């Protein structure tokens, strides 16, 4: 347990909210079951960012699903990371891809997918989806299959 506490600096401490995009707040911990394929899903219904052109707020539900390998993302750090987009200007599609790439850098998962379900603006809903499967593995094939059969 001491080793786990050393890996995670945010749990049980006063929360400092970053005012702009802050990938450095993401933390990972060791997966105790890396030999198993299993899903971890985060549903984040209060995501906000800013339109990079108008500065108007955008609201979304972000869904993150992944198959962990050696590392897993710590949920409080993920919450703070997603909160850091609040004053960040990025298009919906960029937000989803940035989130996915940052989590890949952090954890190197076997597979990951991120969906943004953005609240309509101007009468149009945008639901960007991005995924990744580790190259040269069955997860790469899985990513291709899921992308080609997405909705």
UniProtKB/Swiss-Prot annotation:
Q: Which residues bind substrate?
A: 73-75, 92-93
| E.C. numbers | 1.7.1.13
Catalytic activity as recorded in UniProt:
7-aminomethyl-7-carbaguanine + 2 NADP(+) = 7-cyano-7-deazaguanine + 2 NADPH + 3 H(+)
InterPro entries given in the database record: GTP-CH-I_C/QueF, NADPH_dep_7-cyano-7-deazaG_red, QueF, QueF_type1
Chief location of this protein?
A: cytoplasm
State any GO BP term from the record: tRNA modification
Name residues in a coiled coil: none
Kindly identify the residues recorded as the active site.
51, 58
Molecular function in Gene Ontology? preQ1 synthase activity
> Which pathway does the protein contribute to?
tRNA modification; tRNA-queuosine biosynthesis
Tell where it localizes. Answer: Cytoplasm
Q: Which family does it belong to?
A: Belongs to the GTP cyclohydrolase I family. QueF type 1 subfamily.
Matches recorded under PANTHER family: NADPH-DEPENDENT 7-CYANO-7-DEAZAGUANINE REDUCTASE (PTHR34354:SF1)
Role description: Catalyzes the NADPH-dependent reduction of 7-cyano-7-deazaguanine (preQ0) to 7-aminomethyl-7-deazaguanine (preQ1).
Could you tell me what this protein is called? NADPH-dependent 7-cyano-7-deazaguanine reductase
Q: Which organism is it from?
A: Bacteroides fragilis (strain YCH46)
Which gene carries the instructions for this protein? queF
């Amino acid at each position: 347990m001491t080793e786990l506490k050393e890996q995670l600096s945010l749990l049980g401490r006063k929360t400092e909210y970053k005012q702009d995009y802050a990938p450095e707040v993401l933390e990972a911990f060791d997966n105790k079951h890396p030999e198993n394929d299993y899903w971890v899903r985060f549903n984040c219904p209060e995501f906000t960012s800013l339109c990079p052109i108008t500065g108007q707020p955008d609201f979304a539900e972000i869904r993150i699903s992944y198959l962990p390998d050696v590392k897993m993302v710590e949920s409080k750090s993920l919450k703070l990371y997603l909160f850091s987009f609040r004053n960040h200007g990025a298009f919906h599609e960029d937000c989803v891809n940035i989130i996915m790439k940052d989590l890949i850098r952090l954890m190197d998962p076997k597979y990951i997918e991120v969906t943004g379900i953005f609240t309509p603006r101007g009468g149009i809903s945008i639901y960007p989806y991005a995924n990744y499967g580790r190259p040269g593995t069955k997860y790469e094939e899985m990513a291709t299959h899921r992308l080609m059969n997405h909705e």
